[in-house]
Design a protein with these regions (language model features):
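Short loop/turn elements that form and flank the Walker-type P-loop nucleotide-binding site
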Residues: 16-17, 59-60, 99, 127-128
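Conserved Rossmann-fold cofactor-binding substructure of NAD(P)-dependent oxidoreductases
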Residues: 1-20
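Conserved sequence/active-site signature of Rossmann-fold short-chain dehydrogenase/reductase
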Residues: 6, 71, 111-113
Length: 128
């Protein structure tokens, strides 16, 4: 869907009749987030809570939260937001009442050709 995870009502309507939700919405530019922490919290944490609640309201079978390796021992606001996002997703498995929704997380590492990827660095080192 194209929309804003901060808009709970629209998110809830978008999830009607969905079996699986892949939650990849996030502000991800580390430099931008450091100067806009409140916006990152609204999108990356509160938006995740909206995804959880809308999924439960619609009896979605499975929710997959796309996280990052930056959530491990976070050193910046982006990593901290993803760390919290993972925790509330996992916690939702224990605080969902009678719902059968399964919440899980996946972490990606370095995406080829993305800004900040270490893959080009390793390729250059291998060529040397």
């Amino acid at each position: 869907m194209i929309g804003d995870v901060r808009d709970y009502e629209r998110l809830k309507r978008a999830m009607q009749n969905c079996d699986i939700v892949i939650h990849a919405a996030a502000l991800k530019r580390v430099d931008m987030i450091e100067y806009n922490v409140a916006e990152a919290i609204k999108t990356n944490i509160m938006g995740t809570l909206n995804v959880i609640n809308a999924s439960l309201a619609n009896n979605v079978k499975k929710v997959i939260f796309v996280s990052t390796d930056k959530a491990c021992s976070p050193i910046n606001s982006y990593g901290a937001c993803k760390f919290v996002g993972e925790r509330i997703i996992i916690e939702s498995n224990f605080n969902k009442g009678l719902s059968k929704t399964i919440f899980s997380c996946v972490r990606y590492g370095n995406v080829i050709s993305s800004t900040g990827s270490v893959i080009p660095f390793f390729i250059d080192k291998l060529k040397a």
